[in-house]
């Protein structure tokens, strides 16, 4: 893969990640709290929001792992009947960011408790 091809792929993913993060935001939060979904599910399960985000991330990692190991995937955004492998990568990267946000918030809360 050339540098130009790599940069094009990176740009394609960054554009999709941003668009999908904003689109899915409306499905999982009713206001400004970007972590509302993780907090609510964490409350239901007796977990921390970061643990919920990690579980969601792992679902996508497992799906990507299976696709790579079996070679059974469509390298596109969509495939007949669902998401293509590119979409799963974008979702995983977005969940990494949301997990980082959970940990950032957690670190701030812990810092407040110790000061």
Give the label of every model feature segment:
Residues 1-115:
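Intrinsically disordered, low-complexity regulatory regions
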């Amino acid at each position: 893969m050339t540098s130009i091809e790599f940069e094009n792929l990176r740009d394609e993913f960054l554009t999709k990640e941003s668009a999908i993060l904003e689109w899915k935001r409306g499905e999982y939060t009713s206001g400004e709290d970007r972590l509302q979904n993780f907090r609510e599910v964490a409350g239901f399960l007796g977990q921390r929001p970061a643990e919920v985000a990690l579980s969601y991330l792992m679902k996508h990692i497992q799906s990507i792992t299976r696709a790579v190991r079996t070679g059974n995937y469509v390298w596109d955004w969509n495939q007949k009947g669902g998401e293509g492998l590119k979409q799963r990568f974008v979702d995983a990267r977005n969940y990494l960011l949301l997990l980082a946000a959970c940990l950032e918030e957690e670190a701030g809360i812990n810092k407040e408790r110790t000061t």
